Regions:
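Short acidic/glycine- and proline-prone juxtamembrane loop motifs at membrane-interface regions
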Residues: 142-152, 317-318
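Perimembrane helix-loop-helix junctions
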Residues: 5-8, 12, 171, 195-226, ...
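Hydrophobic, aromatic-rich transmembrane alpha-helices
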Residues: 112, 270-307, 332
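Specific aromatic-rich, kink-prone transmembrane helix
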Residues: 113, 133, 152-169, 177-182, ...
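Membrane-interface transmembrane helices that cradle and orient dolichyl/undecaprenyl
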Residues: 119-125, 158-177, 209, 277-295, ...
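Transmembrane-helix motifs of polytopic, lipid-linked glycan transferases
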Residues: 101-122
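Membrane-interface alpha helices of multi-pass inner-membrane proteins
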Residues: 130-131, 174-190, 196-201, 224-225, ...
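Extracytoplasmic
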Residues: 77, 191-192, 364-486
């Protein structure tokens, strides 16, 4: 009797534990994601995961030092993440890890918001499937601790959708709040404009029992709040919208290289790197997996507009695909659960294959785990950033360095001249950064150090540096101002 009671107690505790995990999956799964990324991802890598990390960190450091994000800094992106990184820099100076923690917080917000939306529109089990798909996507792992603007922008866009799409009657304050959050998304990275039609559809669908007029008013309120928030941020930050935020991305020098075939090839290449997301999304095309959730049309709108936008963009880079990943996991999460539920009654048929499954399932699981963490382990990660250490050796004497790798400068605790902190290939290709501009900035600012190790240095620039600076490392084109060499 006692043994039976103990067994019943253990079984009851297990049932309660499973119920607790299922009931609170919305925040437990993002928390588990953060823990796994912290344990498996190379958080404290002294090298940048992407060149854009250095640009964003450098801009944040300059704004924290009192520089205007547009009047003094050449900047072709919206300002929200720059302001956030400036705040991080103020609280925890020169910490790459702290900045990556901020991005991981946005990743958790994205996972939670996806869960909320899918749960409200399709069900809790479908939401768990969607969040697992997104949380195990290799792209999500890579971007979750890369100091880049795409993930925060997408996270804010999905959060805005989660705010506006409630179970109960839509309230005006919710539409206003959602619109303001979507404005923050746009002012983080403009590519989330592709999600705007889906956002407005969700605002319209939020009050399904209400009359059409009231639903249209909710969508109009959300749109008005988005426009008002966007304009307010643009005005407060003084952003040159057409000249710098739009112009460099549609310049003739960039568009002349556009090829649909090449872009479509990159599109397919980046997409197949998220295999389980693609497979789950394809299940939505099957009769058993066809989504029936209330937001399926909104997700299809997001997917379609995003796909067209990305196929028309040049250059298309891997991190742009996150915009496509959100609707794919939401549709795929529902579809995969519906297929599993439809196949469950026939599960006994798998018994004859249990030996093969006992081998195949663990192999697939391990292979997928390796695929997830591969972005962090493609190459042997160095223990130190040698270039940053060389810069840091002379950092006390002068806090400035002109460099084409601002990540090195940030790790060394140095500022990059505001005219040069956005040292990107696109800026060079569009003529917004020429050798003459580089030379003029170095001559005017007279930074304590110059290091050009990422891009080709013009002969004129080299000659000037040889005449006016002391060479320290020819391989990295590292130069020191003469008065600091004594």
């Amino acid at each position: 009797m006692a043994a039976g009671s103990a067994a019943d107690g253990r079984e009851g505790a297990a049932v309660h534990a499973r119920a607790f995990l299922y009931r609170h999956a919305g925040w437990l799964l993002p928390l588990a994601f953060a823990v796994l990324v912290t344990l498996l991802g190379q958080w404290w890598s002294p090298e940048a995961f992407d060149p854009d990390e250095g640009i964003n960190l450098g801009k944040g450091a300059l704004v924290a030092a009192g520089y205007h994000p547009y009047a003094e800094i050449w900047n072709d992106q919206p300002p929200v993440l720059t302001y956030i990184l400036a705040g991080v820099q103020t609280v925890v100076p020169w910490s790459v890890g702290a900045a990556r923690v901020a991005i991981l917080a946005f990743a958790c917000l994205l996972l939670f918001s996806v869960f909320v939306l899918v749960e409200r529109s399709a069900g809790r089990a479908e939401a768990v499937a969607a969040i697992i798909l997104l949380g195990t996507a290799p792209l999500m792992w890579r971007l979750s601790i890369s100091v880049m603007i795409g993930l925060p922008a997408v996270a804010l866009a999905v959060a805005a959708c989660a705010i506006v799409y409630g179970r109960d009657r839509a309230a005006p304050w919710r539409a206003v709040a959602a619109g303001l959050v979507f404005a923050l998304s746009l002012q983080t990275k403009l590519f989330t404009a592709a999600a705007l039609p889906a956002f407005l559809m969700m605002a319209y669908l939020a009050d399904e029992a209400g009359p059409r007029g009231r639903r249209a008013a909710t969508a109009a309120t959300a749109l008005a709040a988005t426009v008002a928030g966007f304009v307010a941020i643009a005005w407060a930050s003084g952003e040159p919208f057409l000249a710098q935020l739009i112009g460099p991305h549609v310049a003739g020098a960039v568009r002349s290289d556009y090829s649909f075939i090449v872009t479509a090839g990159h599109f397919a290449e980046h997409l197949v790197q998220q295999p389980f997301v693609v497979i789950a999304a394809l299940l939505a095309l099957t009769p058993a997996g066809r989504p029936a959730g209330r937001l399926r049309l909104a997700w299809l709108a997001w997917l379609g507009v995003a796909a067209v936008s990305l196929l028309g963009h040049t250059p298309l880079r891997y991190h742009h695909m996150l915009l496509l990943l959100v609707p794919l996991v939401c549709l795929g999460g529902e579809a995969s659960w519906r297929v599993l539920r439809a196949a469950w009654p026939a599960r006994w048929r798998l018994a004859r294959y249990r030996t093969a499954l006992a081998v195949i399932v663990p192999v697939v699981a391990v292979a997928y785990l390796v695929l997830m963490i591969r972005p962090f382990h493609d190459d042997e990660t160095p223990g130190v950033n040698e270039a940053a250490e060389r810069l840091a050796a002379h950092a006390v004497a002068d806090p400035w360095v002109a460099t084409d790798q601002p990540f090195d400068a940030f790790v060394a605790g140095l500022l990059v001249p505001p005219e040069l902190v956005v040292f990107s290939i696109k800026r060079i290709e569009t003529g917004n950064l020429t050798p003459e501009m580089l030379l003029a900035t170095i001559a005017a600012r007279k930074p304590g150090q110059v290091m050009l190790r990422r891009t080709h240095a013009d002969r004129t620039v080299r000659d000037y540096l040889e005449r006016t600076y002391v060479p320290l490392d020819p391989r990295r084109l590292h130069y020191l101002r003469p008065d600091l060499a004594n």
